């Protein structure tokens, strides 16, 4: 059946509140946040919504809803300026899962590494192939932050090394590290669903014996590694900097992403005293901060 979609423009300060209002007061069946350049909002932490400064709020309604009444309710909420910009359109029902699967293709990162959906054939059987079914966890390689981390891993000599994937999501970085030569990877995530997805994808790639996953409260005491990769968010990267740096052996290498270009310097300041930092790498307004721990 067709649906009605209403798109509103908001800021990161009020977008989530507007989304709540649309769900609770106007009868929206779903609300999606996009940035104003139509880039999907990826990788929210549980209980936290990741938003850009200029955010579109997209609400979906059943086709028989009265759009004029909905717009009156939005106006009456006083959450948007007088004469607020909006777009109303009808969208056809789709098999969204099938459409997503059809558009998820094998992707190459760096010189050797391919990320391949588990339902497609690998394009190069001789390459380093990671077979992936992300399920409900973040991490497919399609987002610039994941791509930045995969390219960084591909450029390292991981032979025999221990790696920590801090915020492991689907396990894509952990599995890639094993496939690229690491002896062992420890995945840490606050979301139990991510740990399940990481385990499933590790088994799919035949590396389940080399990957351990933990909630932060369950990780082994004194855990340190040769390499740490943390593709999370700028806020946690700042707040958890003592913990993240503590996971790294002296001389070990660290890469962090999930950082917008406007946030990069503020994140780097939390690591500059303890690491020799590389030049910041950028891709589509997203950044990777990397370096080697001093000592």
Curated annotation (Swiss-Prot):
A Pfam family of this chain: PrmA
Plastid among keywords: no
Task of the protein: Methylates ribosomal protein L11.
A GO CC term attached to the entry: cytosol
InterPro entries the record matches: Ribosomal_L11_MeTrfase_PrmA, Ribosomal_PrmA_MeTrfase, SAM-dependent_MTases_sf
NCBIfam families attached to this UniProt entry: prmA
Subcellular location field: Cytoplasm
UniProt similarity note: Belongs to the methyltransferase superfamily. PrmA family.
Keyword Ubl conjugation attached: no
Gene: prmA
Protein name: Ribosomal protein L11 methyltransferase
Keywords in alphabetical order: Cytoplasm, Methyltransferase, S-adenosyl-L-methionine, Transferase
GO molecular function: protein-lysine N-methyltransferase activity
SUPFAM superfamilies named in the record: S-adenosyl-L-methionine-dependent methyltransferases (SSF53335)
GO biological process, one term: methylation
Catalytic activity, EC: 2.1.1.-
Main location: cytoplasm
């Amino acid at each position: 059946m067709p649906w009605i979609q209403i798109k509103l423009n908001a800021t990161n300060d009020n977008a989530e509140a507007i989304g709540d209002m649309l769900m609770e007061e106007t009868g929206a069946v779903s609300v999606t946040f996009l940035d104003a350049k139509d880039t999907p909002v990826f990788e929210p932490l549980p209980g936290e919504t990741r938003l850009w400064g200029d955010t579109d709020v997209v609400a979906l309604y059943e086709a028989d809803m009265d759009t004029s009444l909905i717009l009156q309710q939005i106006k009456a909420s006083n959450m948007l300026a007088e004469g607020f910009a909006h777009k109303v359109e009808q969208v056809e029902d789709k098999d969204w899962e099938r459409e997503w699967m059809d558009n998820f293709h094998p992707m190459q990162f760096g010189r050797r590494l391919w990320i391949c959906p588990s339902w497609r054939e690998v394009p190069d059987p001789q390459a380093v192939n990671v077979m992936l079914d992300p399920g409900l966890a973040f991490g497919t390689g399609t987002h610039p932050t994941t791509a930045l981390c995969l390219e960084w891993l591909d450029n390292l000599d991981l032979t025999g090394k221990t790696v920590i994937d801090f915020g492991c999501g689907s396990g894509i970085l952990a599995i890639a590290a094993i496939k690229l030569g690491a002896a062992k990877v420890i995945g840490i995530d606050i979301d139990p669903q991510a740990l399940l997805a990481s385990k499933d994808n590790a088994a799919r790639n035949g590396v389940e014996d080399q990957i351990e996953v933990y909630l932060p409260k369950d990780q082994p005491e004194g855990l340190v590694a040769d390499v740490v990769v943390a593709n999370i968010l700028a806020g946690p990267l700042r707040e958890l900097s003592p913990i993240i740096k503590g996971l790294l052996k002296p001389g070990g290498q660290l890469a962090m992403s999930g950082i917008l270009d406007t946030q990069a310097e503020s994140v780097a300041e939390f690591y500059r005293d303890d690491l020799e930092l590389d030049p910041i790498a950028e891709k589509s307004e997203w950044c990777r901060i990397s370096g080697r721990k001093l000592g």
